[in-house]
Amino acid sequence: MTAAYLPSILVPIIGIIFPGLTMAFAFIYIEQDQIN
């Protein structure tokens, strides 16, 4: 029963949080590169 609800939870996490983390790490890397 709970397995049917897993995709509705994993898809937003992969589609929203993962790109958000990628952009955050890219932003931090660029900011550190500019400071140095």
From Swiss-Prot:
Keywords (alphabetical) are: Chloroplast, Membrane, Photosynthesis, Photosystem I, Plastid, Thylakoid, Transmembrane, Transmembrane helix
One GO cellular component term:
chloroplast thylakoid membrane
UniProt key word Phosphoprotein = no
Cross-referenced InterPro entries:
PSI_PsaI (IPR001302), PSI_PsaI_sf (IPR036357)
Q: What is its main location?
A: plastid
- What domain of life does the UniProt record list for this protein's source? Eukaryota
Transmembrane regions listed in the UniProt entry: 10-30
Gene Ontology BP, a term? photosynthesis
Keyword flag Transmembrane: yes
- Which cell locations does it reside in? Plastid, Chloroplast thylakoid membrane
Q: How does it sit in the membrane?
A: Single-pass membrane protein
Q: Which SUPFAM superfamilies match?
A: Subunit VIII of photosystem I reaction centre, PsaI
| Membership in a protein family | Belongs to the PsaI family.
What is the role of this chain? Answer: May help in the organization of the PsaL subunit.
Q: What is this protein called?
A: Photosystem I reaction center subunit VIII
